Amino acid sequence: MSEPDVKSHKIEFPCDDYPIKVIGDTVVGFKDTVIEILSKHAKVDLSTLAERQSKEGKYTTVQLHIVAESENQLHDINSALRATGIVKMVL
């Protein structure tokens, strides 16, 4: 039996509709902090904004789309978000 043909899914830049999901502690201003950081690094489409809290209310998820220009830009966004201390994961 042969291995299935698995293709690597590479992002083609620029990507005008790149989804970002940020998970972090539920604190006052979490959504605004995420938007502020993303806006410093990329064009943000606020019409795609979605916010949700975990069942217990401990974590908040903010989702939206940005214009992704490069791998370096995505790395910088991840680093800036994680540096806040309130962001647990960036997907």
Swiss-Prot record:
One of its GO terms (cellular component) is cytosol. It holds the Pfam family DUF493. Transmembrane segments: none annotated. InterPro entries: UPF0250_YbeD-like (IPR007454), YbeD-like_sf (IPR027471). It comes from the Bacteria. Disulfide bonds: none annotated. Belongs to the UPF0250 family. HAMAP family: UPF0250. NCBIfam families: PRK00341.1 (NF001486). This is UPF0250 protein Pput_4677. It comes from Pseudomonas putida (strain ATCC 700007 / DSM 6899 / JCM 31910 / BCRC 17059 / LMG 24140 / F1).
